[in-house]
Amino acid sequence: MPKPGEYTPDTTEGITRVEDLPKPRIKRRTRNRRRRPCPRCGHNGYRLRSVHRTLHDLGDVISGRPCDVHIHYSQHRCPKCKIYFNAPMDDLALPKCHYTHRVVALAVRLVVEDGLPYRAASWHLWRDHRIFVPFGTVQNWVEAGGGI
């Protein structure tokens, strides 16, 4: 165990292969229901199929491992208005996004409040939170939010 003020190098420093990185800790969540109300008309839509989605969340600082959220959710079809819809996941992540709201908020905060460049913010997320976000993605999030 390191003493206070003692330098300890990053455990992932020098790793060049993705297979050698620490395996992520998995959190399992489910949004799989038989029926859901249709977002358009409110009629009960029946489950058509179950689908899987993986989101990357802030990692575990103590163990030094990344964290992934595996979500099993249901896709439904409304018999009344004939539309297809998914179980809502707006509280976890934006549609078609691979990262949770916590990751997006932290990345934008690093750039806007702390004034870090995009590349440094990306490195900070990996070093301190064990989540890899390409710096171009961080730039897209900041520009979409109107931060700079």
Question: What role is predicted for each listed range?
Answer:
Residues M1-D90:
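Short, conserved DNA-binding cores of transcription-related domains
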Residues V61-I148:
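Short, positively charged, Gly/Tyr-enriched micro-motifs
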